[in-house]
């Protein structure tokens, strides 16, 4: 598999974590959010990687906790006129693409994603133009502009099936932006894949040596790995899958101990799914390195209670997602192709973002 545009050396401008709230402040903002949701005819949709208290509030108020695509689909089916998306910016954009008639708010518009940042639309378009014979498949973790340039959008839960399908048609693929997931689907499918060289700052930090040491401490534990992780880490897994697939694996695997290599935000729903099991965070860094994300996306951490309340209360340019209508229509085409493909396979599309 060929690769290009190595962004390993990129120094992303990590945001400051929200100032911790005390018990009284948390209670105040929870009640304020509940009131504002009713006043604005809004529903709170949160990603699996947000902090547990945010996921709990989404459930308590009739919202949902899911991956980025399911968040958008939930918003489409929910009667609320406003969606408050607790996640990162591309998730808000996806919600707006699929729900143009609704107001989409976010706690902050500065919640980025290293995969999105590592795939600038102009550079990616030029790269695609230089390989006109290839079908362009992009991961959901991309901007609206990158989606608009693609032939297909895909989530990790159906990535292998889609690439196998395209390969059976004799098509050669451009895959973007995650090189580890691209490598995973190429190995599984055997397709001709030209891969953009992006990476998730969280999953890229999992290391085999540290994981092997933890496995030695817990030899009876199963290892669950998201395919955005390096191939050597994936090779150590008992189960590989998207966020939703890892939660399902946690329920169905016989082991009572689970070592989980993905963002630790997933532990909230995973522990709900299997309360009788013991969960361990897979180690990040190791092998002489220090962790930067330390198994939690710094941009997901921006979705605090105070920020959610401010997003609902203030709206406007600081919190509302807008997508150019022409761009939205272009991005909707590959998104709908993915949804149609998933329906034909009789799969419920649940990816990672």
UniProtKB/Swiss-Prot annotation:
<comment type="similarity">
    <text>Belongs to the quinolinate synthase family. Type 1 subfamily.</text>
</comment>
<keyword id="KW-0662">Pyridine nucleotide biosynthesis</keyword>
<keyword id="KW-0408">Iron</keyword>
<feature type="binding site">
    <location>
        <position position="47"/>
    </location>
    <ligand>
        <name>iminosuccinate</name>
    </ligand>
</feature>
<dbReference type="InterPro" id="IPR036094">
    <property type="entry name" value="NadA_sf"/>
</dbReference>
<feature type="binding site">
    <location>
        <position position="200"/>
    </location>
    <ligand>
        <name>[4Fe-4S] cluster</name>
    </ligand>
</feature>
<feature type="binding site">
    <location>
        <begin position="226"/>
        <end position="228"/>
    </location>
    <ligand>
        <name>iminosuccinate</name>
    </ligand>
</feature>
<protein>
    <recommendedName>
        <fullName>Quinolinate synthase</fullName>
        <ecNumber>2.5.1.72</ecNumber>
    </recommendedName>
</protein>
<comment type="function">
    <text>Catalyzes the condensation of iminoaspartate with dihydroxyacetone phosphate to form quinolinate.</text>
</comment>
<feature type="binding site">
    <location>
        <position position="68"/>
    </location>
    <ligand>
        <name>iminosuccinate</name>
    </ligand>
</feature>
<dbReference type="Pfam" id="PF02445">
    <property type="entry name" value="NadA"/>
</dbReference>
<feature type="binding site">
    <location>
        <position position="297"/>
    </location>
    <ligand>
        <name>[4Fe-4S] cluster</name>
    </ligand>
</feature>
<comment type="pathway">
    <text>Cofactor biosynthesis; NAD(+) biosynthesis; quinolinate from iminoaspartate: step 1/1.</text>
</comment>
<feature type="binding site">
    <location>
        <position position="156"/>
    </location>
    <ligand>
        <name>iminosuccinate</name>
    </ligand>
</feature>
<keyword id="KW-0808">Transferase</keyword>
<dbReference type="InterPro" id="IPR003473">
    <property type="entry name" value="NadA"/>
</dbReference>
<dbReference type="GO" id="GO:0046872">
    <property type="term" value="F:metal ion binding"/>
</dbReference>
<dbReference type="GO" id="GO:0005829">
    <property type="term" value="C:cytosol"/>
</dbReference>
<dbReference type="GO" id="GO:0034628">
    <property type="term" value="P:'de novo' NAD biosynthetic process from L-aspartate"/>
</dbReference>
<dbReference type="InterPro" id="IPR023513">
    <property type="entry name" value="Quinolinate_synth_A_type1"/>
</dbReference>
<feature type="binding site">
    <location>
        <begin position="139"/>
        <end position="141"/>
    </location>
    <ligand>
        <name>iminosuccinate</name>
    </ligand>
</feature>
<dbReference type="GO" id="GO:0051539">
    <property type="term" value="F:4 iron, 4 sulfur cluster binding"/>
</dbReference>
<keyword id="KW-0411">Iron-sulfur</keyword>
<feature type="binding site">
    <location>
        <position position="113"/>
    </location>
    <ligand>
        <name>[4Fe-4S] cluster</name>
    </ligand>
</feature>
<keyword id="KW-0479">Metal-binding</keyword>
<dbReference type="GO" id="GO:0008987">
    <property type="term" value="F:quinolinate synthetase A activity"/>
</dbReference>
<feature type="binding site">
    <location>
        <position position="243"/>
    </location>
    <ligand>
        <name>iminosuccinate</name>
    </ligand>
</feature>
<keyword id="KW-0004">4Fe-4S</keyword>
<keyword id="KW-0963">Cytoplasm</keyword>
